């Protein structure tokens, strides 16, 4: 198979949502219908019945939320699919934002009862900025939901994108009958299947005028469906794939992931319309997937995916060419040649060694501590891929060693967890104390839990009053030195040795910006 043929087979996408919209459940069902798993780990009302395949960290299984991005690959109808299931909890949005740099399209899950929520808007802003094609899945139709047309209006208004429904629900809640597939012009009726298997019984009706429809869903609902689909065709433009690929139009599907409604239709339409790997921007040029030479970048690092083996995996997105096992590649940041004897493909925590990987694929590289998020690998060209964000943390605490005998374990744990990008480490210039900065409070809990369970280290937190952390730099060396001297008590360095100003109030920050005109203050820093 040629490189171009391999490229056209790949579909790499992320599933994103506001917490509790049913994102991990939908991911499970896509894997189920794709044949990658045979029974989904039903995740209901935040209680884990069976651990969801994609929630592979112990704390995720306990709490019923996703706090790290996991990668799952499978083959379906001749296509190679990579799904990235992202954290829904807003405290872990940073991991989600970074994941969006590694995907070619996105499925946004919306709770049909709640509509568009705050986290959904923020995620859509990132998709819009990156011009990432978006499909919307309106979930939980088995519960009472907003009117479908009201939901479509809300999506257009709140997410600022034109929509086109490609499926349509028949009622919702207790009277939910199923979903009409507008794209394929057929109706598939599912029964609620608590066994959660993919072979749920279906009834197909290819003609809405057929009297069979009245028999299956009653005359009342059949009449309503005919009117609704007529209205859809009258109100919304015909589906335009090019507009979807330009991120100007969002196809919308309706269903209930937990009951298997509408998931198969979503998957089958997705593999037909979603983009294959797209060009990737670097600081110097655009990299095209069909280029002969391999390029790729690390968008995530995860320590202890298997606590028994203390392994650390760097997730590499292949952007062009062919990645080969045991072939030398340039690690651009260090300038060193490296080869990998056991690169892996993923099915959540299940990993298998691969010999080749192609654009769109995500490869796991064993990492002994050499890699950072944003690192680029090439066959010799010095490239740096752009747009992998790091956000200014909003919550801060001192981290202290709670067990003097475990100093080394704590230091190693902090070092590795910060490399993953779960939080940021600052060392105070005043007293050398370590400060952890996070986007949300739950991250402190996760760090403490993982230090205890993965590194056998104990930490305790102490409060510190910081309003904002901002990275500073200046072409005026004299003013920079003067600033650092005057603000010594508020200065720190980050893990990479960069200067950071820890402003204790918004007034102090505004005053610093006013008095030191030659200094640039950054609230985000790309890795």
What do the PLM-derived regions correspond to, one by one?
Residues 1-527:
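Structural and coupling elements of P-loop NTPases
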């Amino acid at each position: 198979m040629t490189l171009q043929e391999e490229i056209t087979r790949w579909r790499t996408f992320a599933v994103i949502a506001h917490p509790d919209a049913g994102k991990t459940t939908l991911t499970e069902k896509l894997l189920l219908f794709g044949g990658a798993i045979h029974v989904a780990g039903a995740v209901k009302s935040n209680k884990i019945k069976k651990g969801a395949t994609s929630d592979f960290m112990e704390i995720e299984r306990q709490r019923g939320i996703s706090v790290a991005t996991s990668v799952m690959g499978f083959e379906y109808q001749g296509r190679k699919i990579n799904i990235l299931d992202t954290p829904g909890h807003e405290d872990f949005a940073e991991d989600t934002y970074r994941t969006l740099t590694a995907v070619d399209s996105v499925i946004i899950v919306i709770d049909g009862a709640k509509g568009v929520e705050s986290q959904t808007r923020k995620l859509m802003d990132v998709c819009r900025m990156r011009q990432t094609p978006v499909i919307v899945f309106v979930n939980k139709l088995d519960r009472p939901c907003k009117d479908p047309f009201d939901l479509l209006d809300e999506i257009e208004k709140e997410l600022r994108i034109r929509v086109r429904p490609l499926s349509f629900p028949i009622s919702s809640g207790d009277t939910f009958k199923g979903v009409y597939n507008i794209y394929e012009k057929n109706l598939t009726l599912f029964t609620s299947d608590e066994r959660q298997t993919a072979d749920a019984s279906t009834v197909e009706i290819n003609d809405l005028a057929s009297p069979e429809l009245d028999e299956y869903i009653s005359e009342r609902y059949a009449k309503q469906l005919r009117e609704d689909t007529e209205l859809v065709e009258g109100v919304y433009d015909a589906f335009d794939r090019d507009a979807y690929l330009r991120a100007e139009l969002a196809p919308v599907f309706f269903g209930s992931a937990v009951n298997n409604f509408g998931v198969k239709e979503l998957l089958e339409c997705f593999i037909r319309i979603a983009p294959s790997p797209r060009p990737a921007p670097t600081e110097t040029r655009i990299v095209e997937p069909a280029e002969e030479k391999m390029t790729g970048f690390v968008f995530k690092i995860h320590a202890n995916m298997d606590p028994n083996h203390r392994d650390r995996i760097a997730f590499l997105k292949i952007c062009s060419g062919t990645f080969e096992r045991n072939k030398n590649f340039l690690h651009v940041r260090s300038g060193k040649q490296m080869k990998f004897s056991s690169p892996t493909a993923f099915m959540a925590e299940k990993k298998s060694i691969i010999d080749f990987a192609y654009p769109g694929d995500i490869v796991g590289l064993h990492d002994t501590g050499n890699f950072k998020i944003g690192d680029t690998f090439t066959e010799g060209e010095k490239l740096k891929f752009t747009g992998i964000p790091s956000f200014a943390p909003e919550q801060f605490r001192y981290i202290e060693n709670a067990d003097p005998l475990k100093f080394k374990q704590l230091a190693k744990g902090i070092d590795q967890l910060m490399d993953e990008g779960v939080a940021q480490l600052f060392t105070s210039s005043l007293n050398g104390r370590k400060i952890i900065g996070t986007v949300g409070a739950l991250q402190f809990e996760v760090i403490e839990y993982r230090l205890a369970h993965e590194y056998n280290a104990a930490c305790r937190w102490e409060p510190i009053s910081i309003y904002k952390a901002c990275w500073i730099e200046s072409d005026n060396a004299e003013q920079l030195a003067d600033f650092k001297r005057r603000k010594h008590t508020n200065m720190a360095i980050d893990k990479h040795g960069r200067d950071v100003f820890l402003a204790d109030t918004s007034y102090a920050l505004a005053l610093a910006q006013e008095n030191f005109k030659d200094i640039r203050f950054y609230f985000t820093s790309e890795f």
